[in-house]
Amino acid sequence: TVKYEWAYGTPNPSSSAVYPIKGDLKVISTDPNIRYTFTRVGNYIMRLKIDNGESIVFKFYTLNVNSGLDEGILILNTDDQDHSLLTFIKTRTPEEEEEGAQEIYEDIVGMINPGIEITKGVDLYIANKNSEGNYPDLVVSSADDKGSIISMDPRNFELKKVLKVEELYPGVKCLNFAGFSSSASGRYTMMNGTDGAIYRYDLLTNDVALRTDSRNLGVEKAYYGTFDDDHYHFFYKESVIYAPSYAKIDSTSVASGSSLTDYKIVNMVFKRRGVRELWVITRRKSDNNIVLHKMSSTFTQYAKRLDYAETEPMAMDENSVMITTRRSAQMYYNYDNKVYRWDYASRIPTINSKPAITPPAGEEITTLGRSYDENYLYVGTYNPARSGKKGSLYIYDFATQNLVKSYEGIVDKPVKILYKYRM
């Protein structure tokens, strides 16, 4: 008589492990043909044991259990009453594409977690993959009366924790998340608070901690760049950029900021391909000239790359959202309801330059984003004259600037757009 035993466990993350399963096994069947429903998403190793009385054979199978909500576009959006929603546009399978089917979940947070609401949504962030191939958190920050940060499992949107920042640091809310970092002590995203200080949001414990050496810095904005799989955090105010260490949070002093004393920072962008470079767009205080600086790879020194007088108003300001791509040596940004394309070392487009993209009449650009494969640019818009939902998403090809797809009137005013990639 042949005996069968099906069991499963979690994968052993060590590449040198002799056995592929970590920890205990759960036996789920002794039938030749297995029928079993998993109740949790995740990665598993299934083991089949076959015993004919004379020999025993083991076979192993890798299983990826998904929720059906594992890939698509996320749009954080807010209405006139400051009620925010996280809308999810599920990526279609080839079969669904052929049928023309589309799944849009207007309020994915409330659908999965009844009773959980977002007020005054500010920022949205998905952490990078960790060593086991999973990303630990999807987080949404808000400017509600508690400074709430909502943490969810990005695979299925299940609530992990609602952290009320103001209960730990009175009067403080998160203005922006600033990229992902990891060290021997954990994984975290940096963020800047409304008090001008820098904080660390721990993605393992879902807690927040003040970086004490930043208490009196008065930073106004956060920016993060990515190069390969590395993230770089930058916090800045009028003429000073702070670049905290990327490994251990306390290994260097953030207070030793890199100063551009004679200039006022307009915006900055981290190059996505070629070499690791931070470009800083400034105005010289003495003559209002536009000056482009390239920051060194150590982020401590500047090289002036372009210095010119403004003959026409520059089509860029501190509110321009900068979007880079590995597919091009150029980047995109928005200004005055248009999208411009810019080559880092060249002059900034002016208000009379031809834009790369102009949205349909009546649409006001509120934010930009990009697809995970970096082939597409997302343009979030708001049309106050539209009935019903006033927000839309337009998707353009990075290379050609052609419109690929539009979703009109599906959200309120878009605040942040991200692509949630498959685990």
What residue ranges belong to the model's regions?
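Hydrophobic core register within WD40 beta-propeller blades
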Residues: 86, 122-125, 175-180, 268, ...
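Acidic/polar, low-complexity intrinsically disordered N-terminal segments immediately downstream
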Residues: 1-116, 382-401, 406-410, 415-423
